[in-house]
């Protein structure tokens, strides 16, 4: 029998067993914990109906998991969820594709809606959508790995839902990323799942990002073909994740 939840906590400090994994904050027969440096290691080991991917910057508690279970029961056909993060300065929410072609955070008071990507620190996926979507692309910057995964889910027929009352406590790492690295990761993520038109809209404002895209276009095309073959994504699904 499958566990109800597996929590994958991702941190570079867990690489190659270089540190003793921390003791889980709590245990339960229906819950598994995995402390890894690569999300895929956790996905491969997971045996739960729902898989939570989290950084060390958020606090996975019993209350959060109980709320997640209630959301799963209320929305049984939903494949993934993007929790809001409650910080000392307010809420941090999921992201949609903005009018400027970039990922933009939804309004703090946004109602229930489908989104393009979660915050990089927390997301929940059903086993069924993980089985259809496959592995996380860890060649992308960490900031875009879950965004890429959620966009690829569209082609597998899955969508990510933002539910305002699904909240987790945390303090996301707001360290500034190198602009060049951000733009490179963003344009590759957009191109893989949404094609040259989405990549081009982003590049209109960040023309140097074309260099990052075309320098690795052959490998990206292989990944894009794998993602979109037999795609179930519709125009309506794409419209729902835009600003």
Label for each model-derived stretch:
Residues 105-128:
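A recurrent flexible, glycine/aromatic-enriched loop bordering the glycosyltransferase active site
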Residues 55-59:
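The conserved acidic donor/metal-binding loop of glycosyltransferases
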Residues 51:
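Short aromatic/hydrophobic "clamp" motif used to bind/position activated sugar donors
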Residues 1-22:
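N-proximal low-complexity "stem/linker" segments adjacent to membrane-targeting elements
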Residues 40, 48, 62-73, 147:
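Short alpha-helix within the catalytic core of nucleotide-sugar-dependent glycosyltransferases
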Residues 159-240:
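Active-site-adjacent helix/loop segment of glycosyltransferases
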Residues 63-95:
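Conserved donor NDP-sugar-binding/catalytic core segment of glycosyltransferases
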Residues 117-122, 134-151, 155-162, 166-169:
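Donor nucleotide-sugar recognition loop
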């Amino acid at each position: 029998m499958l566990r109800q939840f597996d929590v994958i906590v991702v941190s570079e400090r867990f690489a190659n067993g270089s540190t003793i994994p921390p003791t889980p904050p709590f245990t339960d027969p229906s819950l598994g914990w995995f402390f890894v440096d690569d999300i895929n290691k956790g996905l491969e080991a997971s045996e739960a109906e729902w898989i939570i991917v989290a950084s060390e910057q958020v606090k996975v508690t019993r209350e959060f998991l109980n709320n997640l279970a209630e959301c799963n029961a209320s929305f049984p056909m939903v494949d993934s969820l993007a929790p809001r993060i409650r910080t000392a300065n307010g809420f941090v929410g999921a992201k949609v594709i903005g009018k400027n072609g970039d990922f933009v955070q939804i309004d703090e008071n946004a109602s229930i809606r489908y989104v393009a990507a979660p915050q990089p620190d927390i997301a929940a996926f059903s086993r069924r959508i993980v089985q259809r979507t496959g592995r996380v692309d860890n060649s992308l910057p960490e900031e875009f790995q879950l965004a890429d995964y959620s966009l690829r889910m569209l082609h597998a027929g899955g969508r990510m839902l933002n539910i305002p009352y699904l909240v987790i406590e945390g303090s996301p790492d707001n360290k500034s990323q190198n602009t060049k690295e951000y733009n490179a990761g963003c344009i590759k993520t957009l191109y893989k799942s949404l094609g040259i038109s989405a990549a081009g809209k982003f590049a209109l404002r960040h023309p140097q990002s074309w260099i990052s895209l075309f320098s690795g276009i052959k490998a990206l095309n292989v990944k894009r073909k794998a993602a979109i073959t037999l795609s179930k994504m519709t125009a309506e699904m794409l419209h729902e994740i835009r600003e």
